[in-house]
Amino acid sequence: MHNIHPHPKFSIITVTYNAEKVLEDTIQSIVTQSYMNVEYIIVDGGSTDGTLTIVNKYKEHIHTLVSEPDKGLYDAMNKGIKLATGDYLCFLNAGDGLHEDDTLL
């Protein structure tokens, strides 16, 4: 039988590219979670709009940021997976959101 940690770490990965219109709502849905054992990773494909300005507003809540050109969505997702250290992995892409502040509980 596996020992399950009573407070597992969630690695949440947001993959984004030129998503300034929808990204802030996504980030806010993470930073307002009442569950605290969350590792937040953002993988940006080298955005040329205001995406990084939004990301920088929340930098104290983002554990890892990668911003560089990639080979598409799945390449960016794989970068995030390699960086994740959590017990559980969740993709929450730009425009998605956790709709309640206790979603991870």
What positions do the PLM features span?
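Nucleotide-sugar donor-binding/catalytic module of glycosyltransferases
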Residues: 1-105
